[in-house]
Amino acid sequence: MHLQGTNTYLVGTGKSRILIDTAQKNCKLANQYQKGLPVWINRISSFLYTHKIELSYVLLTHWHGDHTGGVPDLISRNSSLADKIYKNRPDSGQNPITHGQIFSVDGATVRAIFTPGHSVDHMCFLLEEENALFTGDNVLGHGFSVAQDLGRYMDSLRDMASLGCRIGYPAHGAVIEYLPGKLEEYIQHREGRERMMLSALTRQRVRGEGVREEGVKCGLTLNEIVMAIYGKLPPEVIEKALAPSLLQVLWKLTEDRMVGFKPGDPLKRQWFALEQRKRNKVRGCPS
């Protein structure tokens, strides 16, 4: 079943099934555990009642409100479900999910895969009968996802690729008919951006050290990196569309010991490509 903006999956072939993710919370309500979208609970309840289906497990890919918002409504309709909610880093009253944990019902064996990066608690679920992967928000049916921790996210994408699943069931968008290709696209997209940014910083370092022009510096600010890669863009485009993701790349390159920086505001500080011999340093301006 695909309900509203977040895809909700009922998994299994018998009367007892697994539900993966719930609908988004009502945006007018501040608490993510208050009631979600009425249309979602009405549809899912009607489907379960009509087909005489019971839920054995409710699996949540991660904590974001558009995946957990329907939990209170499920419990309000059926209080027995309170003991059947599973999430990595569970909230009060929920059950934990661990990497490799198996959830089984008739026609479906689902294995939990820990895939942090988009969020700290993100899980994917492998449906062994189909060699398919419920990708959560790590890989979408359209466009690209965002990452809270880019380094861990890239590791998770590679872990997902190593599973060899052909089909992907994303939390948003259409079914991914060939998941290996989509994962490769995601990985190449991120790695390509890393290469572009490191190349821009390396060119600036070579220019600053080699030419020794008066006033030429070895590093670049975020805005200058954008200018070097994309040309001149409106400030609002940089601030809202590019800055968050590019800063993530810079932090990852710093953690990978490829880039250093001067202290200060991340948007205004200078970032430097480190020399090979100095890449054992995590931060700082190269001499």
UniProtKB/Swiss-Prot annotation:
One of its GO terms (biological process) is secondary metabolite biosynthetic process. It is an enzyme of class 3 (hydrolase). One of its GO terms (molecular function) is beta-lactamase activity. Its EC number is 3.1.-.-. Zn(2+) 2 binds at D66, H67. Lactamase-like protein; part of the gene cluster that mediates the biosynthesis of neosartoricin B, a prenylated anthracenone that probably exhibits T-cell antiproliferative activity, suggestive of a physiological role as an immunosuppressive agent. The non-reducing polyketide synthase nscA probably synthesizes and cyclizes the decaketide backbone. The hydrolase nscB then mediates the product release through hydrolysis followed by spontaneous decarboxylation. The prenyltransferase nscD catalyzes the addition of the dimethylallyl group to the aromatic C5. Zn(2+) 1 binds at H62, H64. Keywords: Hydrolase, Metal-binding, Zinc. It comes from the Eukaryota. Its cofactor is Zn(2+). Binds 2 Zn(2+) ions per subunit. This is Lactamase-like protein nscB. SUPFAM superfamilies: Metallo-hydrolase/oxidoreductase (SSF56281). Pathway: Secondary metabolite biosynthesis. The active site is at D66. Belongs to the metallo-beta-lactamase superfamily. PANTHER family: ENDORIBONUCLEASE LACTB2, LACTAMASE-LIKE PROTEIN APTB-RELATED. InterPro entries: Beta-lactamase_class-B_CS, LACTB2-like_MBL-fold, Metallo-B-lactamas, RibonucZ/Hydroxyglut_hydro, Sec-metab_biosynth-thioest, WH-like_DNA-bd_sf.
